[in-house]
């Protein structure tokens, strides 16, 4: 099964997450199929908090990929940002 989930990066006490497509059997920071965007929970000022290729997310969901709960919330946030822009 394929999932769209977060993989952690960044420094200690300063997390940064990539939103990726991966097989559920892969480790959290292991092999991925495609990188769809990123999530910066500590963004400040004009830095974007979520950058996500919603067209590719729709493609993967159409092919049977499942989103984790956090990625589903980020996807909604990215779609609302795109609609507002």
From Swiss-Prot:
InterPro entries named among the record's database cross-references: Ribosomal_bS16 (IPR000307), Ribosomal_bS16_CS (IPR020592), Ribosomal_bS16_dom_sf (IPR023803)
Which Pfam families does the record associate with it?
A: Ribosomal_S16 (PF00886)
Q: Name one GO biological process term.
A: translation
**Is this entry keyworded Nucleotidyltransferase?**
no
- Does this UniProt record's set of keywords contain DNA-binding? no
Can you list the GO cellular component terms from the UniProt entry? Answer: cytoplasm; small ribosomal subunit
Lineage, top ranks? Bacteria, Pseudomonadati, Pseudomonadota, Gammaproteobacteria, Lysobacterales
Checking SUPFAM superfamilies in the record gives: Ribosomal protein S16 (SSF54565)
The UniProt similarity line reads:
Belongs to the bacterial ribosomal protein bS16 family.
Q: Do you know which Gene3D superfamilies this protein is assigned to?
A: 3.30.1320.10
What Gene Ontology molecular function terms does this protein carry? structural constituent of ribosome
Alphabetical UniProt keywords: Ribonucleoprotein, Ribosomal protein
What species was this sequence derived from?
Answer: Xanthomonas oryzae pv. oryzae (strain KACC10331 / KXO85)
* PANTHER family in UniProt: 30S RIBOSOMAL PROTEIN S16, SMALL RIBOSOMAL SUBUNIT PROTEIN BS16M
Question: This chain belongs to which protein, by name?
Answer: Small ribosomal subunit protein bS16
Q: Which HAMAP family match?
A: Ribosomal_bS16
